[in-house]
């Protein structure tokens, strides 16, 4: 019995690089053909608050589970369909009950700040999702942000809520292998054995594929069911994600799983390659800087696109931002820090003193 499943989140996390503006027909085909490739779990997009998002199609920012119905194939057995809800960005009380015609599961993400400041409300959202009948995936954003003690407190909450899965999330692409080993060990040894571990990484250090193999190896020692996230071509903001095609190939050739790799290649050629013409993702030194400073990718994108800065300068400005603020994005603050940094970097005192020596007391006509 296989204990590893793949969750493809191209239409959700991959789509962030194009503001999730997938044409409806493309969303339908990507979803359908991922199912044909025997991908276990397909994430079709976000669920957002209809008071803030006006859904008119051609987007995977949905506001109602009924809008997702055309993009799931209920005739394909063995496939789970999910949507992602960020805490505070959806009206959870208007979520329609599960009826078997749309998504099967909801991945629910919250930050440490959310949990520290609004713990009771975060737990209420968790309970609402379960009460509505959906399989629940709990994603504590940025796992590295928790101390071991804090993470164990979250695991206690997870054991009580008893979701389908709980995630190790490398939100800012900042993990190294020892971080993965430590987090996996803590969770695996303290979480109920029938709750899956869901691993989601970003490729800032070009380690996503290595991490996936490590988590698979670790799961073999405990018979834990695990879920590995990926996107087609690694599509995603800045460094992007684990490539779905890489983990598919690994599991087919090394573990004798039965995914259809050729179907994945066709999806890449038919739908993903075209996005690389206007949108860049993958490893870069700028992406590395985002990992080093655990920074929201939008900060790096803004500094790169607006100011055309060198990687070293990007790192210097990121280091000037408060660590907690760095995990969000505030363009006004970045503008202010950029001006401050450039002012300090451009030190013209030496040039002025040299001119004074040359000119002396002579008059200058400009």
Placement of each model-derived feature along the sequence:
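Catalytic cores and adjacent flexible loops of soluble metabolic enzymes
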Residues: 1-366
